[in-house]
UniProtKB/Swiss-Prot annotation:
Keywords recorded for this protein, A-Z: Cytoplasm, Elongation factor, GTP-binding, Hydrolase, Magnesium, Metal-binding, Nucleotide-binding, Protein biosynthesis
Annotated protein name in UniProt: Elongation factor Tu
Residues that bind Mg(2+): 26
Species of origin: Cutibacterium acnes (strain DSM 16379 / KPA171202)
Stretch list, region G1: 19-26
Purpose of the protein: GTP hydrolase that promotes the GTP-dependent binding of aminoacyl-tRNA to the A-site of ribosomes during protein biosynthesis.
EC number(s) given by UniProt: 3.6.5.3
Gene: tuf
Primary localization: cytoplasm
HAMAP family documented for this protein: EF_Tu_B (MF_00118_B)
Subunit structure: Monomer.
Length: 397
């Protein structure tokens, strides 16, 4: 079997299945894989159910998450699809962003309708900025009453609208993932209809390359006769020799400088692109003016802040987290991109304390400014070990 070449010709999109336990998320993931494999065998391998269900554990920022990654192609797009077997894995994945989602397929069993985790996943999807949701109304082969299915569909649309998604217009596709896996023709077609809806309704994400340049600085050193070099992995955008950039964060003032060279593996490049580890040579910048934790960015594209609201998952003791709860005025380190900055936590009114395993909102004040934007991820650490993971939900100042 020749190794398939990753074709860059199709736009790429990251999606995931969300929804209540036992409503058929993993069965649907397997069904999509099988149906697309049968329709486009040269484009798609098949991922069987048990392979997805026994998802490998991944460690993200010291948090163990079981997550299954599969890929498949429709005629229009290349997809990376994530499925988490356990509910706790979902919550952790959504908050830590272990697997980014450009859109989600909400699986709701027509036999049950929306359940508590259905609501929780939709709320999480909104909080973490998932732009669009397509609904897969599953197990429709088990419901004979058309009115009952219509009722469930109405409930799901209302739920989506209540969480600021477009409940009126989002596609709701009636499927049976189990029957599609068995090869039933009618239900196989329902899976193809679902993927057509995903192709059409989930917007094409802006590629990292097209976003404004940003590189978190990992290291700084001097090359005699040439100046100061900062190294790191380009998070987004492109940086070219001769361009003006800003150095943002940690210090009160943002510095402006010009890129005089870009290097990768000791080779001189014209530019550094998203995803690449590069060294960037800066004109007239002193080594002592730059520290790890700052970012190099396109002028005006990111700003330094000290106060923000965040949503945080607090690790349980058996995940290596704290053994005891914490209260307001707790002062751990907040790890943004490449560095720790001490911050003080204020819990929301009515929340006395936060226990290991909780999911909470908090307001944080950092002692140094950090280049940040909405949805930026961070870890909470104590003495170098991760005790929580979160993302910025609102910048205060």
């Amino acid at each position: 079997m020749a190794k398939a070449k990753f074709e860059r010709t199709k736009p790429h999109c990251n999606i995931g299945t969300i929804g209540h336990i036992d409503h058929g998320k993993t069965t649907l993931t397997a069904a999509i894989s099988k149906v697309l494999h049968d329709k486009y065998p040269e484009l798609n391998e098949e991922s069987p159910f048990d392979q997805i269900d026994k998802a490998p554990e991944e460690r993200q920022r010291g948090i163990t998450i079981s997550i299954a990654h599969i890929e498949y192609q429709t005629e229009k797009r290349h997809y990376a699809h994530v499925d988490c077997p356990g509910h706790a894995d979902y919550v952790k994945n959504m908050i830590t962003g272990a697997a980014q989602m450009d859109g989600a397929i909400l699986v709701v069993a027509a036999t049950d309708g929306p359940m508590p985790q259905t609501r929780e996943h939709v709320l999480l999807a909104r909080q973490v900025g998932v732009p669009a949701i397509v609904v897969a109304l599953n197990k429709c082969d088990m419901v004979d009453d058309e009115e009952l299915i219509e009722l469930v569909e109405m409930e799901v649309r209302e739920l989506l609208t209540s969480q600021e998604f477009d409940g009126d217009n989002c596609p709701v596709v009636r499927i049976s993932a189990f029957q599609a896996l068995q090869g039933d023709e009618k239900w196989t077609q329902s899976i193809l209809d679902l993927m057509d809806a995903v192709d059409e309704y989930i917007p094409q994400p802006e590629r990292d390359l097209d976003k404004p340049f940003l590189m978190p600085i990992e290291d700084v050193f001097t090359i005699t006769g040439r100046g100061t070099v900062v190294t790191g992995r380009v998070e987004r955008g492109v940086v070219k020799t001769g361009e003006e950039v800003e150095i943002v964060g940690i210090h009160e003032k943002t510095q402006k400088t010009t890129v005089t060279g870009v290097e990768m593996f000791r080779k001189i490049l014209d530019e550094g692109r998203a995803g690449e580890n590069v060294g960037v040579l800066l004109r007239g910048t002193k080594k002592e003016d730059v520290v790890r934790g700052m970012v190099l960015s396109k002028p005006g594209s990111t700003t330094p802040h000290t106060d923000f609201e965040g949503q945080v998952y607090v690790l349980k003791k058996d995940e290596g987290g704290r053994h005891k709860p914490f209260f307001s005025h707790y002062s751990p380190q907040f790890y943004f991109r490449t560095t720790d900055v001490t911050g003080t936590v204020e819990l929301p009114e009515g929340t006395e304390m936060v226990m290991p395993g909780d999911n909470t909102d908090m307001t944080v004040h950092l002692i140094h400014p950090v280049a940040m934007e909405d949805q930026l991820k961070f870890a909470i650490r104590e003495g170098g070990r991760t005790v929580g993971a979160g993302r910025v939900t609102k910048i205060i100042k």
